[in-house]
């Protein structure tokens, strides 16, 4: 503080006090912000430090510059530029500003925000109070208490910061948001500067949320079209469509006026918000937004408001019963009797509680939001006047809720309509779940009064007493609101039981339809509509779903559905059209009922839809009849009398409701497969009706395809019926009017209410027709270019994918369409990176992206032989986006790199893939696409594969995991495509081993595969999911991995040793199969195991060779196999096992014919077999024990092999004969002149290794006295001495063969002194 003079206080708030000051020894005027530490939590102090750190690094002419900051014992002091005033003050004094001044301020605000967003900083509290006036008329943005600098890993935020008047829709709904929330706030500020009031203004937080989410902005005529367009862009409710960077800079309203401050960015800053995200990051952002999206539908803002309301109500309840209760909100004072509950006069405290609840909604708690500013009281009348003059008053009921009239509950009639109307307003549901209805339901007196009023009046009506029906109508409306707005299933269902719901409204409906006296009453239509509204709201309650069943609610729901169907069937059977509105409302209620049934179990759906074909057939027949009955003309012929618009709309209501009901009955909802089978029954019935030649249903339905209201629903009906009826597809393929309507719809020549969704259904329907017919219906051959245009130019992702689906089918039928690679690559990138909105199940059980993947595969096949284009695809963003989107569809678990405030994220509990996005068929297409690319650009693709943690490698490994394969085997068409998926993955993983790759790259690939235990996955998939013929490639890959990586080999051995008998049985079947390549791979794997690992790991190999009955049938089959490669590897395996296995030696002795098979290999025509066999016999002879005598038969064959042309065979034969010497076979060896042959080899064989083997054998054999004598008689010492001398004459001792040592030792052993 010694640096500054404190002059005067210029402001005060919840944060502390602001003083005007001057820096000592200078004329610089500053603002000093004193923030007390006392009473602040650690989190608040951290946030303060964050604000200081953010401000410290900001240098911009339109942002307040922090000059200094320091701490005292009790306070934190922040020193900033001194501003001349606040923009808020100008609004207070002048009301609004001329547009040219607003334009200047807009350019400066945009400049400041551009600077912040380019540094990945969100302000999060943009409002007039945070905009200061600088010298010369400029503005400066201040107050960064809620600002957030986002890391490169954080794409969206979820914490609620800011002031409600300027909050964006995504903020008030507590959805994830990004920098576009700041841009919405700028739009609100500029609107307020120009008009005098914010675009959404009310004193009720609940109404404010509703306005922000649902109401359009009201545009006064005083603003220019350019300014209006600018504000419309900023105030777009969908943040994805909101005007943002960089387009914002180029808008004519501010173009050329914005100051851009550029400065070097840090290397770790990441992508600035002012640049468009690369598509792969856009995919990650969408995924992060999806994960961060709130699970419920309650807003944190409104939960806080309701909490405050409840606390206030409780405080009022504790006050004296007779005292008046004042609630000051800056506008009015409300007494406890402002909103009394009808008939609640038991105690003043109870009345006070409910009155407080109702009055609290009118109380303005602005100090709890944002920085704590209250509404500007002095401007209140001005704002109201401005709204009244500029716009029509939209909500008279809102004004009524702010009434200052005092009502005396003692003198008011208990059941007045005004009281019920106030309760109705309190219980009305907003766009998000409010707590007021929940608070009402928690009050037993309110519930009792509602229930008694409903039962009392309802039972009177059922008894024919019609007085007081008018009191029933507001009660019914309150019930509708409560049922629609409360999410507490237990509480709500208990209330319904006590109130007699839904039995009483259904009984009243039935009685009203049957009573002629009621039908004569003026309120008859209103009563029917309100009763249906209650029933509809009841059907939409969550306690009707099996997954959230409360008590016997599911049974009650089914009974109520049956009663309603009875009433609906009778209603549809009537020819009286006097109550068209009631008929329409009943049909819409039926559509809601279908949605509720679809969300239930298979049993509930089956029973409901089956009843429409049996006991409730009247409903279905009535709907079909209603569709064929001639209605008022939809299009007035030329010269005919014009029909008034209200009458026209009324005439369209019932046909629209009928078509909507039919669509609800047969359309399979996305992601709810439990009801598909049940709905197929209805679709079959409709399809049969449509295929009858005499039926009027098909012409009526087809003619409705060109009607702007009916089109979408009737398209869904046709699509559902064609989905299961091939006959209907053939009929429609020959129906000119139907095809013409579909083609005109795709071409945009039919004006319909929901063109995008209708076109999507039409595209899928045409795809289905081509697929079913395997031919092109008339006129479709010219459709290619128009569908291609939709594919490349539409911004609606669902349309792009539907167009891709149809293009794929057209391409298979030979239709040509001109798609340039640059266009289809860009279209694919857009379709894959934008959020997926699946509204309809694509044809033939496909996923949302299947059609796109199949089309991409077709397009890629067309450019085979053009490596440059393939390289462009792999190098483009679409390749990366493709695998990111696929991994999202697979729901790969991954760690969350950042958390938003205290929000803890977890990976999805279920790893089942999202089959609505990509089906097994789509996965097969994607992997085929990857194979085609890998084949032509192997090295480029390997770089993607070898990156540690790459999405491509993670995805491929996941496709082999047991959990995924289990889900795949249970999916529709999963068993059919499972082998295709597995084999495609294996082919892709084989590439690193089939190519000449860098050693480091291969090490990285092996480490990835080892970490995921791919060897284990391959073994399990072969054992549990593939046929023997399909297992060849996985076994080959498994073998390659185990031979290359010792850790993978151990994984294989441990899996076999610890798993069930299934794996041993599978391997045994392989060894006995007629698949020589697979047998050879397995034998190589087993041989490598026997060579590398200790004998304790080899028991399973012994088990495999002996067979289940220990007859050694597998080993016999292998040794006698017709394929040379199999015999070579079988003898090699046997040779390695005989080094350790005593059991195998015993089997050679005890098993009849087994030793003979071993010895037969010594005379095999194939040299490789002879070499392996001689190796095996040599190991069998080593320490043969009891087997030794039996090996005498091998001596002649082995002696003959000493003269083999293959040096390896000669070496093995010499070693084997040397091993037989100590086994007492001297006579047999002498008989075959083995000593002489070995001596000749030792002295004259051209190969040093063979000489060495012969010398070692002679050293072993000379231990037998008879052989020793023969060697002496042959002059072996002299011959060997000459050999030794020749080796000594070599110039370099390092080049002398190892046989020299053996030669000297043997000479020493043959000396007479040694022999004696």
Curated annotation (Swiss-Prot):
Chemical reaction(s) catalysed: L-seryl-[protein] + ATP = O-phospho-L-seryl-[protein] + ADP + H(+); L-threonyl-[protein] + ATP = O-phospho-L-threonyl-[protein] + ADP + H(+)
Organism: Mus musculus (Mouse)
Disulfide bond residue pairs: none
Positions that bind ATP: 10-18, 33
Protein name: Serine/threonine-protein kinase 36
Protein family (similarity comment): Belongs to the protein kinase superfamily. Ser/Thr protein kinase family.
Gene Ontology CC, one term: cytoplasm
Acidic residues composition bias: residue spans: 407-418
InterPro entries, per the entry: ARM-like (IPR011989), ARM-type_fold (IPR016024), Kinase-like_dom_sf (IPR011009), Prot_kinase_dom (IPR000719), Protein_kinase_ATP_BS (IPR017441), Ser/Thr_kinase_AS (IPR008271)
Main localization of the protein described in the UniProt heading: cytoplasm
One Pfam family per UniProt: Pkinase
Source taxonomy: Eukaryota, Metazoa, Chordata, Craniata, Vertebrata
């Amino acid at each position: 503080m010694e640096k500054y003079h404190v002059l005067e206080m210029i402001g005060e708030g919840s944060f502390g006090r602001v003083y005007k000051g001057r820096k000592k020894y200078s004329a610089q005027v500053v603002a000093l912000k004193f923030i007390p530490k006392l009473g602040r939590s650690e989190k608040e102090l951290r946030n303060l430090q964050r604000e200081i750190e953010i401000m410290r690094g900001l240098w911009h002419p339109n942002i307040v510059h922090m000059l200094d900051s320091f701490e005292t014992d009790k306070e934190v002091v922040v020193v900033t530029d001194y501003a001349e005033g606040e923009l808020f003050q100008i609004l207070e004094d002048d009301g609004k500003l001329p547009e040219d001044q607003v334009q200047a301020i807009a350019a400066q605000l945009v400049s400041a925000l551009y600077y912040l967003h380019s540094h990945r900083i969100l302000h999060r509290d943009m409002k007039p109070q945070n905009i200061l006036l600088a010298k010369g008329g400029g503005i400066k943005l201040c107050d960064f208490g809620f600002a957030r600098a986002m890391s490169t890993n954080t794409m969206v935020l979820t914490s609620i910061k800011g002031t409600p008047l300027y909050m964006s829709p995504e903020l008030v709904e507590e959805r994830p948001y990004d920098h576009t929330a700041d841009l919405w706030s700028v739009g609100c500020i500029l609107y307020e500067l120009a008009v005098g009031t914010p675009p959404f203004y009310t004193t009720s937080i609940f109404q404010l949320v509703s306005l922000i989410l649902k109401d359009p902005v009201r545009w006064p005529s005083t603003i220019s079209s350019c300014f209006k367009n600018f504000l419309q862009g900023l105030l777009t409710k969908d943040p994805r469509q909101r005007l943002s960077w960089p387009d914002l800079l180029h808008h004519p309203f501010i173009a050329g006026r914005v100051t851009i401050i550029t400065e070097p960015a840090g290397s770790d800053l990441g992508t600035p918000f002012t640049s468009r995200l690369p598509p792969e990051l856009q995919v990650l952002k969408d995924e992060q937004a999806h994960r961060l999206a709130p699970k419920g539908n309650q807003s944190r803002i409104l939960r806080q408001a309701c909490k405050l309301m409840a606390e206030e109500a409780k405080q009022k309840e504790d006050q004296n019963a007779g005292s008046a209760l004042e609630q000051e909100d800056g506008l009015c004072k409300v007494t406890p009797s402002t909103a009394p509950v009808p008939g609640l006069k038991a105690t003043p405290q109870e009345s006070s509680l409910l009155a407080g609840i109702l009055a609290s909604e009118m109380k303005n708690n602005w100090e709890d939001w944002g920085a704590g500013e209250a509404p500007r009281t002095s401007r209140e009348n001005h704002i109201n006047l401005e709204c009244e003059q500029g716009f029509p008053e939209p909500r008279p009921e809102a004004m009524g809720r702010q009434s200052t009239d005092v009502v005396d509950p003692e003198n008011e009639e208990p059941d007045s309509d005004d009281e019920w109307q106030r309760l109705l307003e309190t219980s009305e549901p907003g766009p998000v779940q409010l707590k007021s209805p929940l608070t009402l339901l928690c009050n037993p007196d309110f519930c009792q009064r509602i229930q008694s009023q409903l039962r009392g009046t309802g039972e009177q009506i059922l008894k024919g007493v019609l007085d007081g029906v008018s009191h029933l109508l507001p009660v019914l409306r309150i019930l509708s609101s409560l049922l629609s707005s409360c999410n507490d299933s237990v509480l709500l269902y208990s209330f319904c039981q006590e109130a007699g719901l839904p039995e009483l409204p259904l009984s009243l409906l039935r009685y009203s339809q049957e009573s002629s006296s009621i039908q004569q009453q003026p309120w008859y239509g209103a009563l029917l509509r309100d009763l249906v509204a209650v029933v509809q709201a009841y059907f939409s309650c969550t306690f009707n779903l099996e997954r959230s069943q409360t008590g016997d609610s599911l049974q009650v729901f089914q009974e109520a559905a049956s009663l309603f169907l009875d009433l609906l069937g009778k209603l549809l059977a009537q020819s009286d059209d006097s109550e068209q509105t009631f008929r329409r409302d009943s049909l819409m209620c039926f559509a809601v009922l279908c949605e509720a049934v679809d969300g239930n179990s298979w049993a509930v759906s089956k029973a409901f839809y089956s009843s429409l074909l049996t006991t409730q057939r009247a409903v279905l027949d009535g709907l079909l009849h209603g569709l064929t009955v001639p209605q008022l003309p939809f299009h007035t012929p030329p010269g005919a009398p014009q029909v008034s618009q209200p009458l026209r709309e009324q005439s369209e209501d019932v046909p629209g409701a009928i078509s909507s009901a039919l669509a609800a009955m047969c359309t399979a909802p996305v992601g709810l497969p439990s009801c598909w089978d049940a709905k197929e029954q209805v679709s079959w019935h409709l399809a049969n009706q449509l295929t009858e030649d005499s039926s009027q249903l098909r012409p009526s339905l087809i003619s409705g395809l060109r009607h702007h209201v009916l089109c979408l629903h009737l398209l869904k009906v046709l699509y559902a019926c064609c989905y299961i009826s091939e006959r209907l597809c053939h009929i429609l393929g020959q129906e000119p009017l139907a095809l013409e309507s579909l083609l005109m719809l795709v071409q945009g020549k039919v004006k319909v209410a929901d063109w995008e969704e209708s076109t999507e259904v039409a595209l899928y329907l045409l795809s289905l027709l081509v697929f079913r017919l395997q031919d092109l219906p008339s006129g479709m051959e010219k459709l290619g270019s128009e569908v291609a245009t939709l594919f490349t130019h539409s911004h609606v992702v669902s349309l792009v994918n539907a167009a891709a689906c149809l293009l794929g089918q057209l391409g298979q039928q030979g239709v040509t369409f001109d798609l340039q690679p640059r266009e289809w690559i860009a279209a694919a990138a857009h379709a894959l990176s934008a959020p997926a909105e699946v509204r309809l199940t694509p044809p033939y059980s496909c996923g949302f992206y299947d059609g796109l993947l199949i089309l991409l595969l077709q397009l890629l096949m067309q450019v085979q032989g053009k490596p440059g284009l393939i390289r462009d695809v792999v190098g483009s963003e679409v390749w990366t986006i493709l695998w990111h989107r696929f991994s999202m569809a697979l729901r790969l678990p991954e760690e969350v790199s950042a958390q938003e405030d205290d929000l803890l994220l977890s990976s999805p509990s279920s790893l089942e893939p999202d089959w609505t996005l990509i089906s097994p068929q789509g996965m097969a297409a994607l992997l085929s696409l990857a194979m085609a690319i890998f084949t032509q650009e192997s090295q480029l693709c390997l770089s993607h594969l070898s990156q540690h943690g790459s999405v491509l490698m993670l995805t491929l490994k996941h496709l082999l995991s047991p959990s995924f394969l289990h889900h795949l085997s249970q999916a529709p068409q999963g068993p059919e495509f499972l082998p295709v998926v597995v084999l495609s993955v294996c082919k892709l993983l084989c590439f690193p081993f089939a190519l000449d790759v860098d050693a480091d790259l291969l090490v990285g690939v092996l480490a990835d595969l080892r970490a995921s235990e791919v060897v284990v996955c391959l073994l399990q998939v072969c054992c549990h999911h593939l046929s023997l013929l399909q297992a060849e490639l996985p076994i080959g890959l498994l073998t390659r991995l185990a031979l290359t990586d010792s850790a993978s080999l151990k994984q294989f051995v441990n899996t076999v040793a610890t798993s069930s008998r299934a794996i041993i049985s599978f391997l045994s079947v392989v060894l006995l199969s007629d698949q020589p390549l697979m047998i050879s791979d397995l034998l190589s794997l087993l041989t490598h195991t026997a060579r590398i690992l200790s004998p304790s790991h080899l028991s399973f190999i012994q088990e495999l060779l002996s067979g289940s009955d220990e007859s050694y049938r597998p080993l016999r089959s292998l040794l006698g196999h017709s394929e040379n490669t199999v015999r070579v590897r079988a003898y090699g395996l046997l040779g390695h096992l005989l080094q350790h296995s005593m059991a195998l030696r015993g089997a050679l002795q005890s098993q009849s014919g087994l030793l003979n098979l071993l010895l037969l290999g010594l005379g095999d025509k194939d040299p490789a077999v002879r070499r392996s066999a001689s190796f095996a016999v040599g190991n069998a002879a080593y320490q043969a024990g009891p087997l030794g005598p039996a090996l005498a038969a091998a001596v002649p064959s082995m002696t003959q092999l000493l003269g083999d042309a293959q040096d390896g065979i000669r070496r093995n034969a010499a070693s084997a004969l040397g091993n037989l010497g100590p086994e007492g076979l001297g006579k047999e060896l002498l008989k075959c002149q083995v000593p002489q042959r070995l001596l000749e080899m030792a002295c004259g064989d051209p190969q040093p290794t063979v000489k060495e083997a012969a010398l070692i054998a002679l050293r072993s054999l000379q231990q037998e006295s008879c052989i020793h004598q023969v060697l002496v008689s042959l002059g072996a010492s002299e011959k060997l001495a000459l050999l030794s001398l020749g080796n000594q004459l070599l110039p370099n001792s390092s080049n002398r063969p190892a046989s020299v040592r053996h030669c000297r030792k043997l000479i020493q052993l043959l000396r007479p002194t040694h022999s004696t």
